[in-house]
Curated annotation (Swiss-Prot):
Stated name of the protein: Probable peptidyl-prolyl cis-trans isomerase B
Stored SUPFAM superfamilies: Cyclophilin-like (SSF50891)
Lineage summary: Bacteria, Bacillati, Actinomycetota, Actinomycetes, Mycobacteriales
Reactions this protein catalyses: [protein]-peptidylproline (omega=180) = [protein]-peptidylproline (omega=0)
EC identifiers of the protein: 5.2.1.8
Keyword Isomerase found: yes
Purpose of the protein: PPIases accelerate the folding of proteins. It catalyzes the cis-trans isomerization of proline imidic peptide bonds in oligopeptides.
Gene that produces this protein: ppiB
Cross-referenced InterPro entries: Cyclophilin-like_dom_sf, Cyclophilin-type_PPIase_dom, Cyclophilin_A-like
Residue ranges of coiled coil: none
PANTHER family hit by this protein: PEPTIDYL-PROLYL CIS-TRANS ISOMERASE B-RELATED, PEPTIDYL-PROLYL CIS-TRANS ISOMERASE-RELATED
Gene3D superfamilies recorded: Cyclophilin-like
Organism this protein belongs to: Mycobacterium leprae (strain TN)
């Protein structure tokens, strides 16, 4: 039969084991709490990094044309897929070409130029042909006056005033989702324009204002001629030529098509790639618009 001293010794050992067990549990709790904090911290960091990366991706083109004159932002899908909707069919509105306005923009004109005639503009003839002579070859254009008359009116005015002559095309994109050559900026940095702006037309005008579909990609097919912009209704002089099917939200006014000779010239330019590598930047093959005229 154990003595009192033995019982006390046993009780001490039992208490010691309990205290050690509690201390061990406490240490595990601290480890778990710290680990949880680290996990949360890592999750927050990952979220922030992801947000920054997505933000940079989303604003990449705006940054490239920083003072935010004219930019295109392709949708962040890996490639053109059959599920992407085509451009909507054109349905003329009752006010098409009735009141074209060209108010001053925030930036001064990159070259001396007068704004086009405002007010009502004709939608006839339905198409107007133009020739863009470049140092890389001719690019024939067919302007769609029946669908985007305010845009064609501006383009024709700038062409007649020689605004585009002896200017360089400052941007080429070669990604799977965006293949365009961008021109129309005498400053050659993505910020130049004519000193005025005007509203979007087709295909933007085929949707109700603030329609969520305006933010969803549609297919801008090879051979499309469209306006670059820095946001809704900020069109100026910069335009882009689509040399392979591209995904963009329908917020870039389509005002014509590119003829076969032009597509051959664009293919040659695109084959040269980007001057600094990558898939977006000044073309390695320098492109100068020597003259642009209506036929």
């Amino acid at each position: 039969m154990p003595t009192n001293e033995q019982r006390r010794a046993t009780a001490k050992r039992k208490l010691k084991r309990q205290l050690e067990r509690r201390a061990k549990q406490a240490r595990w709790r601290r480890v778990l709490l710290i680990s949880g904090g680290v996990v949360v911290a890592v999750a927050v960091i990952i979220t922030v990094v992801a947000t920054v990366v997505i933000s940079k991706l989303g604003h990449k083109h705006d940054t490239a044309s920083s003072t935010a004159s004219n930019s295109l932002t392709a949708t962040k899908t890996p490639a053109v897929t059959p599920s992407v909707l085509p451009l909507p069919s054109f349905q003329p509105s009752t006010n098409l070409g009735v009141n074209c306005q060209y108010p001053p923009s925030a930036d001064k004109a990159a070259k001396p130029v007068k704004p086009p005639r405002a007010g009502k503009v004709p939608t006839d003839p339905a198409t107007v042909s133009a020739s863009m002579a470049t140092n890389q070859g001719n690019i024939g254009l067919l302007l769609n006056n029946a669908e985007s008359p305010c845009t064609v009116n501006s383009f024709a005015s700038l062409t007649g005033q020689g605004f585009f002559n002896n200017t360089k095309c400052h941007r080429l994109t070669t990604s799977l989702m965006l293949g365009v050559l961008q021109c129309g900026d005498p400053k050659v940095d993505g910020t130049g324009g004519p000193g005025y702006k005007f509203a979007n037309e087709y295909p933007t005008d085929q949707y109700p204002p603030n329609d969520p579909k305006l933010k969803q990609p549609v297919l801008y097919p090879r051979g499309t001629l469209a306006m670059a912009n820095s946001g809704p209704n900020t069109n100026g002089s910069q335009f882009f030529l689509v040399y392979h099917d591209s995904q963009l939200p329908p917020e870039y006014t389509v005002f014509g098509t590119i003829q076969a000779d032009g597509l051959a010239t664009l293919d040659k330019i695109a084959k040269g790639g980007i001057a600094s590598g990558g898939d977006d930047g000044p073309p390695a093959t320098e492109v100068t618009i020597e003259s642009l005229r209506l036929d």
